[in-house]
């Protein structure tokens, strides 16, 4: 049994970093699994539901914008990854990671360059993390519509930067990422 851990969402100006870890059955036949960035939002949503239904186990980890600012994006990403892995049951025998080795994890790890395009399990973890984060940003948009998080997902689009300059940072903005915009 293997697990895939995928970091996601390091570049946005707002919102948490989200990591996914997925254990797929050995005989998994989920079609169209690929790098989440190469899939349409509709296809990611469809695949998310299939993954959640068929996976042996799924773990999701988060690191808040405040935590990102406190310890830096890389360390916050590692924390989210460790949280995601810790939620898996059963515990995996090996981790296939998208190009990284996660510190403080005792499970053997295999970093794979462009892993989300080369491993269906890493692709599944990528999709779970991206859909989870995108859904969270849509919820934030309901509370803070002026930033248009539903459309920009916290990334630095022109409309997002204009809103940031007009309204200032929200509680979910990453202060260390927006210093040259405010």
Protein language model regions, located:
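RNase H-like, Mg2+-dependent phosphodiesterase core
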Residues: 1-182
């Amino acid at each position: 049994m293997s697990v895939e851990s995928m970091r996601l969402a390091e570049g946005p100006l707002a919102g948490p970093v989200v990591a996914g870890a997925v254990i797929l059955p050995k005989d998994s036949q989920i079609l169209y699994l690929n790098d989440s960035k190469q899939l349409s939002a509709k296809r990611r949503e469809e695949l998310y539901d299939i993954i959640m239904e068929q996976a042996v186990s799924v773990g999701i980890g988060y690191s808040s914008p405040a935590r990102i600012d406190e310890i830096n994006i890389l360390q916050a990403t590692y924390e989210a990854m460790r949280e995601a892995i810790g939620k898996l049951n059963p515990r995996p025998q090996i981790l296939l990671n998208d190009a990284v080795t996660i510190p403080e994890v005792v499970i053997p790890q295999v970093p794979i360059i462009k892993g989300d395009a080369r491993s269906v399990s890493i692709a599944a973890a990528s999709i779970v993390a991206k859909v989870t984060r995108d859904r969270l940003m849509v919820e934030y948009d309901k509370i803070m519509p002026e930033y248009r998080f539903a459309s920009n997902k916290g990334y630095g689009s022109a409309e997002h930067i204009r809103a940031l300059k007009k309204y200032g940072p929200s509680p979910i903005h990453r202060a260390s990422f927006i210093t040259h915009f405010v």
